[in-house]
Amino acid sequence: MTEEKAEEKNKMASVFLPALGGVAVCGGTHGNELSGVYLVQEMERQRKERGDGVWPIPVTTVLSNPRAVKECRRYIDTDMNRCFSKAVLSTPITDSSPYEVRRAQELNNLLGVKGSDDVMDMICDLHNTTSNMGLTLIHYSASDWVTLHICKYLQTKITKVPVRVLVLDFPINDAYNLESVSKHGFTLEVGPQPQGVVRADIYVIMKEAVDLTIDWIHKFNSGTVFEGGDVEVFKFIKSVDYPRDPETRNLTAAVHPQLQDRDFCLLKRGDPLFLSFSGETVTCEEEEPLHPFFINEGAYYEKGIAFHLAKKWTLTVPSVQVQTTNSA
């Protein structure tokens, strides 16, 4: 293929997308995940000192769950990051409604009603995990080219920790996380960090990811062409609980030392999963190799989850650039 034909092919492969009106940066969806709480507060301080011009694009900052933040708890009544499905957002509010359901509906109205034309273009929801996951971007669609290109951009720029992409691939109406309210939302999950603690190194990684997201949006809106290519993603398959006593439901084992802190490793049949409190090893019985993540996450004990399992895929994303009058 000649150079001219190759260039023409690449040009034809480009996808033209509308400019992005801005981003909502949300912290404190879980009130004891403090990197996002302090980053949102710092961004609000910068805006107060320097005005909206501190960023090259419109940025909305949101402290998502202020009551939980004040009490440094994950939530008050129920996990708010499970309250953004269409069903929950349309639930009538009564005197007995959980605080987080009320707040989720407030945020839905603040950021644009989920599924409407006026919804926020992008939500970046900030989270910490006690698991050793580095920086993980979590979103709902394997065909959202904007989000995948931002993931790809962060992977090229951030070198201090692994940057991975996790796709949940749920129907958007069933998607229950805050970022699902927007057109191109994702969660930034950074760890390990204990609940109720802020670590400087983890905070810095989160801040760099937010700054780079804003930078990507500004460049995209300004006409930069982002070349396509392959993106390695992990797709959620299922959750695994701890071994339990069948009568009391108490745990009978902990995550095996050979698995602990090895999020996204390749897990094969026969590999150690758990070490029972009586000293026996429980091994993996999966038929195909999978990748565990959120290993021994502190917040998941109440949910009956020791870790999730994912399958690794390679997605090919097209080149993208902003849609203009000439390209429309």
From Swiss-Prot:
Its cofactor is Zn(2+). It holds the Pfam family AstE_AspA_cat. Its EC number is 3.5.1.114. It is found in: Apical cell membrane; Cytoplasm. It comes from the Eukaryota. Substrate binds at R74, N81, R82, E189, Y300. Binds 1 zinc ion per subunit. Zn(2+) binds at H30, E33, H127. HAMAP family: Aspartoacylase (MF_00704). Plays an important role in deacetylating mercapturic acids in kidney proximal tubules. Homotetramer. This is N-acyl-aromatic-L-amino acid amidohydrolase (carboxylate-forming) A. It comes from Danio rerio (Zebrafish). The lineage of its organism: Eukaryota, Metazoa, Chordata, Craniata, Vertebrata.
